[in-house]
Amino acid sequence: MSGNTGERPFADIITSIRYWVIHSITIPSLFIAGWLFVSTGLAYDVFGSPRPNEYFSESRQEVPLITGRFDSLEQVDAFTKSF
């Protein structure tokens, strides 16, 4: 027979007023914070990913595709020189 861990049952937690008062504030706050994090462009700066208008430069408009099997290192070097 299993023992009692002393924790509240889940049904008691989600039916309590205190739970919904706390979570009615925190869940929308997290959503708004995430939306602001992405919409302001801070996510691009934090993670170092290029913004949508920075994927291709003015000098290089084609996709950097490796075509050769044996000269791939030279192709990668040529692609990285354009950055």
Swiss-Prot record:
Disulfide bonds: none annotated. The keyword Disulfide bond does not apply. Keywords: Chloroplast, Electron transport, Heme, Iron, Membrane, Metal-binding, Photosynthesis, Photosystem II, Plastid, Thylakoid, Transmembrane, Transmembrane helix, Transport. The chain crosses the membrane at residues 21-35. It is a single-pass membrane protein. GO terms for molecular function: electron transfer activity; heme binding; iron ion binding. This is Cytochrome b559 subunit alpha.
